[in-house]
From Swiss-Prot:
NCBIfam families: L27. This is Large ribosomal subunit protein bL27. GO terms for biological process: translation. Residues 7-19 have a biased composition (Polar residues). One of its GO terms (cellular component) is cytosolic large ribosomal subunit. PROSITE patterns: RIBOSOMAL_L27. GO terms for molecular function: structural constituent of ribosome. It comes from the Bacteria.
Length: 89
């Protein structure tokens, strides 16, 4: 009777699917309301003007406009510059 498990082939062989996290819309891109901006675990980016935060910390646009990344009180924030203002600038 063998006392080795044959290179432990039966105990290996599992891997989880990637979570597809990260920034989905970058600075300067135009978005419509409801579009996902950042998928994240925890608040690496905080919601700014016209940006909402979901239960899984996903940031999404509350209004149409252009994406803008910035900082406020030492935190990275994501803002949406409204489309009307973005068209004039």
């Amino acid at each position: 009777m063998a006392h080795k498990k044959g290179a432990s082939s039966s105990r290996n062989g599992r891997d989880s699917n990637a979570q597809r996290l990260g920034v989905k819309r970058f600075g300067g891109q135009s978005v419509s309301a409801g579009e996902i901006l950042v998928r994240q675990r925890g608040t690496h980016f905080h919601p700014g003007v016209n940006v909402g935060r979901g239960g899984d910390d996903t940031l999404f646009a509350l209004a149409a406009g252009a994406v803008e990344f910035g900082q406020k009180r030492g935190r990275k924030t994501v803002n949406i510059v409204p489309a009307v203002v973005a068209a004039e600038v």
